[in-house]
Curated annotation (Swiss-Prot):
This is Alcohol dehydrogenase S chain. It comes from Equus caballus (Horse). The modification N-acetylserine is found at residue 2. Keywords: Acetylation, Cytoplasm, Metal-binding, NAD, Oxidoreductase, Zinc. Its EC number is 1.1.1.1. Zn(2+) 2 binds at residues 98, 101, 104, 112. Its cofactor is Zn(2+). Transmembrane segments: none annotated. It holds the Pfam family ADH_zinc_N.
Length: 374
């Protein structure tokens, strides 16, 4: 029996208040309006940014259905939708690509002007498709993937290879692409170069994969948790260092290790002190440092501008600089062609109802990526 055009009742993980567990609730998901797509979720990853919403580090309106890294199957489409059809395998896009704004038309930019910022908590038209206990529930980044069904705008979804395993390629929706693109697209890592990667979680490991794919000769992983070193080396790090093993600042250690500074450095933690350390450890005349980790909302950085005057470049990007709707299908095709692996990033698979266990694994440092299956 077709559910198209009807309200669907399903389970979703609702966050009612900060610093509290998610609550599995029955929610009502309205049908898609014009230029919207309703998706049956198959798999969703747990990303650190979702946890930042729980902790309040990132401010989102509550109650909210979080989640932004996922894959599913189109259940129904609204009027005027042309890029996907019911039955298509898709990945929701937390950065949309309208194709019409000044950013979408620019060859480099990817932060589409239709981007649904966290404080909005709605669809593009300013309303919600979720109801629970008679109340509207906020959306998250236009995706809200911690629900058995979600509704997204057409500019926020990409059709992918029909043969792709959704429980793996869901990582292309955020973590993998963010890291990999930071190396190959944002930093533009060069053959034979030396790279330093601060933070060896799922995104940091994806940066390492990107550095390796770009032909870096030396890739130094940096983390205070030495349990992460083996996995980092498995995906391409040539060596790993723990800042706690040294009396001097880590930027000095790395500068000495690399005979004057690394060519490329990446901060994949979201801490202000490590952002400056990553910038400082790259070669003063031509080094490039990329901010990948999401910093706390309300903090400002103080640094010495001489670090830049000498010739360093400091960059940042969201979603690895990739234009989402164009790039996600290509990245999935590359995965299917075995150009990179996603298995090393997946440490746990849990049923969606055990979402709080998945977040506990993330917070305790026991997981790289936990995939929730629906």
């Amino acid at each position: 029996m077709s559910t198209a055009g009807k309200v669907i009742k399903c389970k979703a993980a609702v966050l009612w208040e900060q610093k509290k567990p998610f609550s599995i609730e029955e929610v009502e998901v309205a049908p898609p309006k014009a230029h919207e797509v309703r998706i049956k979720m198959v798999a969703a990853g747990i990303c650190r940014s979702d946890d930042h919403v729980v902790s309040g580090t990132l401010v989102a309106p509550l109650p909210v259905i979080a989640g932004h890294e996922a894959a599913g199957i189109v259940e129904s489409i609204g009027e005027g939708v042309t890029t996907v059809r019911p039955g298509d395998k898709v990945i929701p896009l937390f950065i949309p690509q309208c194709g019409k704004c000044s950013v979408c038309k620019h060859p480099e930019g990817n932060l589409c002007l239709k981007n649904l910022s966290m404080p909005r908590g709605t669809m593009q038209d300013g309303t919600s498709r979720f109801t629970c206990r008679g109340k509207p529930i906020h959306h998250f980044l236009g995706t809200s993937t911690f629900s058995q069904y979600t509704v997204v705008d057409e500019i926020s979804v990409a059709k992918i290879d029909a043969a792709s395993p959704l429980e793996k390629v869901c990582l292309v929706g955020c973590g993998f692409s963010t890291g990999y693109g930071s190396a190959v697209k944002v930093a533009k890592v060069t053959q034979g170069s030396t790279c330093a990667v601060f933070g060896l979680g799922g995104v940091g490991l994806s940066v390492i994969m990107g550095c390796k794919a770009a032909g870096a000769a030396r890739i130094i992983g940096v983390d205070i948790n030495k349990d992460k070193f083996a996995k980092a080396k498995e995906v391409g790090a040539t060596e790993c260092v723990n800042p706690q093993d040294y009396k001097k600042p880590i930027q000095e250690v790395l500068t000495e290790m690399s005979n004057g500074g690394v060519d490329f450095s990446f901060e994949v933690i979201g801490r202000l002190d490590t952002m400056v350390a990553a910038l400082s450890c790259c070669q003063e005349a031509y080094g490039v440092s990329v901010i990948v980790g999401v910093p706390p909302d309300s903090q400002n950085l103080s640094m010495n501008p001489m670090l830049l005057l000498s010739g360093r470049t400091w960059k940042g990007a969201i979603f690895g600089g990739f234009k989402s709707k164009d790039s996600v299908p290509k990245l999935v095709a590359d995965f299917m062609a075995k150009k990179f692996a996603l298995d090393p990033l997946i440490t746990h698979v849990l049923p969606f109802e055990k979402i709080n266990e998945g977040f506990d694994l993330l917070r305790s440092g026991k997981s790289i990526r936990t995939i929730l299956t629906f």
